[in-house]
Structure formats: C-alpha cells, structure tokens
C-alpha cells in the first residue's frame, strides 16, 4: 500500500490510518513523503515500518535518523525537482553518510516528471545530489530492487537470481553518469533473454 503524505495530499494522521489498515490486511507499506514540505511523513514512514519512502526533498536530521533506525529505504527521484524547476534536491549525501540505504528511480508520470530515462536520473544523482557514479548505480539497481522487496530475485548479478543484464557501450561505469540522458545500452537481457539493441516498451 502506498500513500502520499504531503501538503495537498494526506496528512500524517490520515497516512497512519491508511497504512495501519493496510498492515492489518497483511500488506507491505511505503509512502511518498516530504516532497513539498516537512509534514512528518518521514517519521510516519519509520513508525509504520515502511519498506521505502519516496522523494524526501524537505528533510531535517531527525527525519534522516528516524529512517535509519527503521531501516526504511530512501527512494530519491531527481527528475521531479528538475521537471518542477524547484532548484533543490533530496539530501542524498546526508542520507548516505547517516547509513540510510538510498535507491534511485524516475518517478515517471505525466504531471511532474515525464521521463522514462533512468540514465538521466543517474546523471542528476551525481551532478545535483553529489552521489558518486558507483553510489548512483547501486541505488538504481540492487537498492531499488530491495525497495520493491525483490532484492532476492533481481538487482545484481548473483547465482540464483534472474539474469536481468545491461551491457553498456562505455569504457567504464563513470560514463553512465557523464553522458546526460544518453542511452549507452549495447545489449539488454531480461530473464536471460536477449532483446533487440534498440528495443521498445512493448518488447520489454
């Protein structure tokens, strides 16, 4: 169950009620939190044992500590502040240095981030949120898989996992962040099956 806790959406108490009901029904919980204002959403995420909290643009040290103590994954979505022209991004460095696991995603949607380009998000993570290329790639792969409770199946190359693999036309991993939004994928495998070099969404 996912709830949006922010100004103009559910407040903290409403979010507690929604996620509490979801937990009683055996659902896992996550939420969109503190995108536009600090409304207690990070604290709610920690209290409710949310597997992840998305956005987190407006954060204080106590919010970061709460996420760390709860083991909640911070899913950072740099395409949204870019699309909205906000001029500020989630405090990735503070989260990482505090020991909060950080994931990275597009937040692709028609209103605030009409981009499907995860490579662009990796670039933004490095240029705007001061993550290293290695941190951004880990955030976009294995940490994102864990944010969906699928880290045991995908997100890294390990025996027993599904062979979801991208081979890049790049001399090293740093070039994934260096080229803004460029598709450097040379070959893509999903579940071990090779796709066309330039594939469409329907082929995936």
Model-identified regions with their sequence ranges:
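Active-site-adjacent C-terminal substructures of enzyme catalytic domains
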Residues: 28, 38-153, 168, 172, ...
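Charged C-terminal helix
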Residues: 176
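Metal-coordinating catalytic core of metallo-dependent amide/deamination hydrolases
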Residues: 2-39, 108
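Mid-to-C-terminal alpha-helical segments outside catalytic/metal-binding sites
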Residues: 139-143, 150, 158-165, 182-204
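Cofactor-binding loop segments of dinucleotide-utilizing enzymes, especially the Rossmann-like FAD-
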Residues: 6, 79, 191
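Well-ordered beta-strand positions
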Residues: 3, 52-55, 165, 187
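Conserved beta-strand segments that form the floor/walls of ligand-binding pockets within enzyme
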Residues: 2, 103, 189
